[in-house]
């Protein structure tokens, strides 16, 4: 691993020319796939853990703006804004602890429908490898890259058809997560690149919904481990 890192850094140094660095603005769209997660609910009946809850596939979209450094044009910073909505559909799952139908000995339970909307804003570090340089593409007409960041997530959960929570009474929580990604950008016109990107994001979302019976707060927690496949356009100047 150390040898591979040294080779990559050496390649980046060798490909860094005397030209000044560049600004960039990206827009992208794609699909997100969120892994199964345990959902923890503290209701008036007690603690219940809904095991292996599935999330629907979601449209993902966003934008990114930033700049590569003058002294190291292979290294840049960007502000990324990213949205996806991994809805929880009606399903039967195993529940440990208190079940919505009553009793705290576990058993089968249903989630019914909850809307989940996640908006993330992140300051990303970007490392690119400029390949196939030309006069019209001084930073490379082919650019593999990797990114990493610690996004702030705003997660809104809205019960729609549940018996456990007060429906249409949403709550929003804020929490930090992390993001790792990689992709490749190809020049399609002067100052314009087409790119494809994979990213993985993680956040532990926490909100407080309303108990349908008592109207007291019912904290809900879940992990959103999400794989996103994106395509987009990048303006460079």
Task: Identify the role of each PLM range.
Residues 16-18:
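N-terminal signal peptide c-region/cleavage motif recognized by signal peptidases
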Residues 32-61, 173-174:
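Surface-exposed strand-loop-strand hairpins of Gram-negative outer-membrane beta-barrel proteins
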Residues 1-7:
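Bacterial N-terminal signal peptides that target proteins for export
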Residues 37-45, 89-96, 156-166, 206-214:
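Outer-membrane beta-barrel translocator domains and adjoining extracellular loop/strand segments
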Residues 22, 31, 64-161, 226-237:
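Gram-negative (and chloroplast) outer-membrane scaffold detector with strong preference
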Residues 38-40, 49, 104, 189-237:
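Predominantly the C-terminal beta-signal and adjacent terminal strand-loop region
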Residues 46-53, 106-114, 163-171, 215-221:
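Extracellular loop and loop/strand-boundary signature of outer-membrane beta-barrel proteins
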Residues 55-61, 117-121, 142, 168-178, ...:
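Residues that define the transmembrane beta-barrel architecture of outer-membrane proteins
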């Amino acid at each position: 691993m150390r040898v591979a890192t040294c080779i990559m850094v050496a390649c980046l140094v060798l490909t860094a020319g005397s030209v000044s660095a560049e600004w960039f603005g990206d827009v992208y769209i794609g699909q997100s796939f969120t892994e199964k997660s345990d959902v923890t609910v503290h209701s008036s009946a007690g603690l219940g853990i809904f095991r292996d809850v599935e999330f629907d596939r979601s449209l993902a979209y966003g934008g990114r703006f930033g700049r590569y450094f003058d002294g190291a044009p292979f290294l840049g910073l960007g502000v990324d804004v990213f949205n996806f909505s991994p809805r929880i559909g009606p399903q039967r799952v195993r529940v440990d602890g208190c079940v919505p139908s009553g009793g705290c000995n576990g058993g089968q339970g249903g989630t019914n429908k909850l809307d989940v909307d996640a908006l993330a804003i992140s300051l990303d570090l970007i490392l690119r490898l400029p390949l196939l340089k030309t006069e019209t593409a001084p930073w490379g007409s082919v650019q593999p890259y990797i990114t990493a960041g610690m996004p702030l997530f705003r997660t809104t959960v809205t019960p729609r058809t549940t018996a456990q929570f007060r429906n249409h009474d949403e709550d929003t929580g804020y929490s930090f997560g992390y993001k790792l990604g990689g992709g490749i950008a190809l020049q399609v016109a002067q100052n314009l690149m087409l790119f494809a990107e994979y990213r993985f994001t993680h956040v532990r979302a926490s909100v407080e919904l309303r108990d349908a019976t008592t109207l007291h707060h019912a904290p809900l927690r879940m992990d959103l481990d999400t794989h996103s496949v994106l395509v987009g356009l990048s303006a460079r100047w």
